[in-house]
Amino acid sequence: MKIIRGIHNIKEINSNSVVTIGNFDGIHLGHQKLFSHIYQIGQKYKLSTIVVLFEPQPLEFLRKNNAPVRITKFREKIRRISSYNFDSILCVKFNKSFQSLSAKDFIINILINKLHLKFIVIGNDFRFGFQRNGNINLLKKLGYKYQFNVIKIRPLYKNNIKISSTNIRKALSENNIKLASLLLGRVFSISGRVIHGNKIGRTMNYPTANILLSKNFLLTNGVYAVKIKYCPNKYAIGISNIGIKPSFSNTQKNKLLEVYLFDIKIDLYGKYIEIFIYKKIRDEQFFPSKKELKNQISQDILIVQKYFNIHKN
């Protein structure tokens, strides 16, 4: 699979293609259904399979700090899309120049002339191009003229809730991790590289692996039951604190994820790990002394161990 960074890096594609376009934030069940359609069409008609996504996501460019918070980092998004064995992922840089490109010009100049479009598979509420003027009607009109097929995937629902990135963000912001995971089709997780902390946990016999989070990270501050994937097919159960460590710092602005692993001692500094978040145990609290914090951590660990003993699968 090729990752094409920017329209200017598109090389000659020798075969016709089936394409989808979007942000695909979270790679939820709706995205997965769409990807399965692309793969099947590619196999059936011997077409190149191409996913077109935008980086940054359009609202991140347009709204800056007021943009919706990402569910999935770019690196994780690419990893999950790559698992479908598509031929190419085209990462389009969303900037002022691209923002002014009309939907019609994008379809003709990029999708048809460069990618040799024969099928396009889109979600139900898909819109694109200058002032979001590109929609299903424009695609069908141009499809008739330029001989490509348009396939619209209907939205999926779980428990009468539409599967969408917006609803997943809402669930996470309300600490409804169970619902978010249901809509994602997997346990909600975050990935990152382990950084050095201030080693306070180590002085209490609770050494932690730390990952820096953005200050507007979706989950609220608190203690969570987690599992981490630290090597291919290697997992460990642990307890995590998400927050700003109020007991020891009043200057930290960004959220930090600290995870203490049960029954395993391994140096994770510098490694890229994935943390699966299952349940919130309590809110983040201030403790006036290390002793009180240590006692609370001991209680938290018992709660998490009990949780995973009950939910072994």
From Swiss-Prot:
Keyword ATP-binding: yes
Annotated EC: 2.7.1.26, 2.7.7.2
CDD domains for the chain: FAD_synthetase_N
SUPFAM superfamilies, alphabetized: Nucleotidylyl transferase, Riboflavin kinase-like
UniProt-listed SMART domains: Flavokinase
Keywords: ATP-binding, FAD, Flavoprotein, FMN, Kinase, Multifunctional enzyme, Nucleotide-binding, Nucleotidyltransferase, Transferase
GO biological process, one term: riboflavin biosynthetic process
Reaction it catalyzes: riboflavin + ATP = FMN + ADP + H(+); FMN + ATP + H(+) = FAD + diphosphate
Record keyword Flavoprotein present: yes
Function: Catalyzes the phosphorylation of riboflavin to FMN followed by the adenylation of FMN to FAD.
Family the UniProt entry places it in: Belongs to the RibF family.
Protein name: Bifunctional riboflavin kinase/FMN adenylyltransferase
Species of provenance: Buchnera aphidicola subsp. Acyrthosiphon pisum (strain APS) (Acyrthosiphon pisum symbiotic bacterium)
